[in-house]
Amino acid sequence: MNDSGEVRSTGSVFFDAVHYMLHQCNKSSHPFLRYLSRIHRFHHLYFTRHLKFDKKYIQQNRFQALPLELVLQIIGTVLGYIFARLVAPKGVFWVTRNHLWITIIFQILRTTFVILSSGRDTNHTTYQTPPEDTNWLFVGPEFHSLHHIYPDRYMGSFVKAFDWIWGTAYTFKGKRIAITGGNGAFGQAIVKKLDREERGSCIRKLKFGTDWDHHHFEKALPVLSNSDILILAHGSKGADAVESNCNAAIRLIKLFKEHRVANPACPTLPEVWYVGSEIELHPAWGNKELQRNSRSKRMFLPQARSFFDDPDIIYRHIVPSAFHSPMGAAALSADWAAKCAIWWIRRGARYIPVTYTGIAWLNYFKFMYRIPYAKDMDQM
């Protein structure tokens, strides 16, 4: 990244912080802050949470909201310039006033063009459902459209640093959740954590033997069809490990994709969270139960890799270190594992290392670059 890009990136973080404050100031005791918040609200009234343009607010957006945004961008850029000058090593990254002026001129020209284009730009695209955002660093229309659906989240304007820091790259608001293994150690912990994150959220447990088994899933369909997130937290180290950890998981995901009904309160892609294990990478050390568990988890990996790149769902692969549960003792609790997983998800992660050993970090490279895509996805 060149020096002007460094100024813009740093300035973006300052702008995003002010942007976040605008969304918090609509009920401020200070009239001026409420006034600024109201002006910015015109932008959201113009490009609505349904990702449509409302022409009724076109003039307020062009001549009030966009000029305010430009002023705040310039202030953020100046602050970013000051910060970059303070931290940039002399002789390595020179950040000069020329870089500052280049960035400001670019912002003025860009905003002028957007105003002349009736307030439309590449970050404001009409979607029925926002597609999956595959860029981990820079903000594009996929990410920014989520901000218009959930105005208090997804604050990034150029880079996603603010959302990483504050955990605003995700929300559970309005999402219906189904979970298998909800009575297990991790399942109970994640349900408890989700209840705290979003009080009143709809979390339904799919019970093994009642709602589904390894070969029968019909009773699970009503829940699957009315869910936005499917969490697969069940697991087995017994003789049925492959059926449970691999084959049944694949079947549940495919049924979820096939039968899920769109939720007007949550116009985003459906999500699948699969709870894997660091045993995907490290050896099983001769224990028969661990060998069965390792084999079943590794058999699922090609399917997981295919789901990870599936444009129709957001697939999150959770890779925890061993945690204390009825399946075995460990140093840390399931509550810690659940809290760590949610911390990562709040920051938009899709590969989620829940680790105190570091193995899950190494497993990331295996998962992304060594695991082949499944060849039999349509035959399962």
Locate predicted features.
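Membrane-embedded catalytic scaffold of the fatty acid hydroxylase/desaturase
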Residues: 7-174
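N-terminal Rossmann NAD(P)H-binding glycine-rich loop of SDR-like oxidoreductase domains
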Residues: 177-196
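Structural signature of the Rossmann-like NAD(P)-dependent dehydrogenase/reductase core
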Residues: 180, 231-233, 268-277, 314-319
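Short-chain dehydrogenase/reductase
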Residues: 180, 242-246, 288-302, 330-335
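Conserved mid-core alpha-helix of short-chain dehydrogenase/reductase
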Residues: 215, 243, 247-258
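NAD(P)H-binding glycine-rich loop region in Rossmannoid oxidoreductase-like domains
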Residues: 217-247
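Catalytic loop of short-chain dehydrogenase/reductase
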Residues: 254-257, 261-312, 324-325
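C-terminal helical subdomain
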Residues: 317-318, 325-379
